């Protein structure tokens, strides 16, 4: 590690079974961490010398490692001893997260999923939970961060993880803006769909019919519609409100679709204008026109108007 490079962030994630470890690790992975579950901590020093297995991970990327009482060779005392030793390295920043939860809530979760607690054998889940809590107590006392998930929903825990460990690691939301023709069906995976069929239709102007929403004359025609400016501004402002919120909530992908009858004029023009406005605001949307070159869409538009 050079003198200027930051130490690699290592987050050890443990806690009571059913308290949310899997959700925490998945959230961290969505945030750009390399996540590994059920890893024997005694092998941690060897793992740190291994190159990342994922092509998207850079050497030194933050790493989240999950382990619990089921992990092979689980031993709280040895884990604490090893981590204390590794924490002395200047190239590592190791944090331990412990996920806790009230016993009654854990019982409810086990009953709801109809799963048996691994330490309860033929006894009630409460017995296994109590034994596990006693075994984990040294780790709970030693952990840097304790999150109690008793009253949490899955979304609550995801947000708590982002708030606690987001820091400078912010994976931007991938934004796709598309145009389409309703006559060919709606895009099945769009998050937001805007219907542009209220705007004046260039299809009915002979000179504009063979052109598309990417041509200047078509754009000028659509802009003359008294409703265009206000509609554009309201849609733009709504997206500028929503997109940062989506990113804060960890939404990886947002697909914004604009539709008109054939998908060649009004929807194309609005999609182009909104994409340009979002780029000016600092976003990097990908722009797709599904039916732009479709002769069939043009024929259908002539039928439906």
Swiss-Prot record:
A Pfam family recorded for this sequence: RapZ-like_N
Family of this protein: Belongs to the RapZ-like family.
Residues annotated as binding GTP: 68-71
Keyword Coiled coil part of the UniProt annotation: no
UniProt name for this protein: Nucleotide-binding protein Saro_2904
Keywords linked to the UniProt accession: ATP-binding, GTP-binding, Nucleotide-binding
Molecular function in Gene Ontology: ATP binding; GTP binding
Domain of life the protein comes from: Bacteria
UniProt-annotated binding residues for ATP: 15-22
Lineage of the organism: Bacteria, Pseudomonadati, Pseudomonadota, Alphaproteobacteria, Sphingomonadales
Organism, scientific name: Novosphingobium aromaticivorans (strain ATCC 700278 / DSM 12444 / CCUG 56034 / CIP 105152 / NBRC 16084 / F199)
Transmembrane segments: none
Function: Displays ATPase and GTPase activities.
Matching InterPro entries: P-loop_NTPase, RapZ-like, RapZ-like_N, RapZ_C
């Amino acid at each position: 590690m050079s003198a200027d490079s930051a130490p690699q962030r290592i987050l050890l994630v443990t806690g009571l079974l059913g308290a949310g470890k899997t959700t925490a690790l998945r959230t961290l992975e969505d945030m750009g961490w390399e996540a590994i579950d059920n890893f024997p901590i005694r092998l941690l020093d060897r793992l740190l010398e291994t190159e990342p297995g994922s092509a998207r991970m850079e050497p030194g990327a933050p790493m989240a490692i999950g382990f619990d009482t089921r992990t092979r060779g689980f031993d709280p005392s040895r884990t604490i001893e090893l981590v204390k030793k590794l924490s002395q390295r200047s190239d590592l920043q190791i944090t331990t997260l412990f996920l806790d939860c009230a016993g009654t809530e854990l019982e409810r979760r086990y009953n709801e999923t109809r799963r048996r607690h691994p330490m309860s054998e033929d006894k009630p889940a409460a017995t296994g939970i109590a034994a596990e809590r006693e075994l984990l107590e040294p780790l709970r006392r030693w952990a840097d961060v304790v999150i109690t998930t008793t009253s949490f929903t899955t979304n609550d825990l995801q947000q708590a993880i982002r708030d606690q460990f987001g820091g400078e690691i912010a994976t931007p939301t991938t934004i796709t803006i598309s145009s389409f023709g309703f006559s060919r069906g709606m895009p099945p995976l769009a998050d937001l769909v805007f219907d542009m069929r209220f705007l004046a239709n260039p299809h009915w102007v002979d000179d504009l019919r063979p052109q598309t929403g990417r041509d200047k004359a078509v754009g000028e025609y659509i802009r003359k519609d008294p409703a265009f400016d206000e509609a554009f501004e309201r849609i733009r402002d709504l997206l500028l409100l929503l997109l940062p919120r989506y990113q804060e909530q960890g939404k990886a992908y947002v697909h914004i679709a604009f539709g008109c009858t054939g998908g060649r004029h009004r929807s194309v023009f609005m999609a182009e204008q909104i994409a340009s406005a979002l780029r000016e605001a600092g976003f990097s949307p990908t722009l797709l026109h599904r039916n732009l070159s479709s002769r069939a869409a043009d024929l259908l538009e002539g039928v439906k108007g």
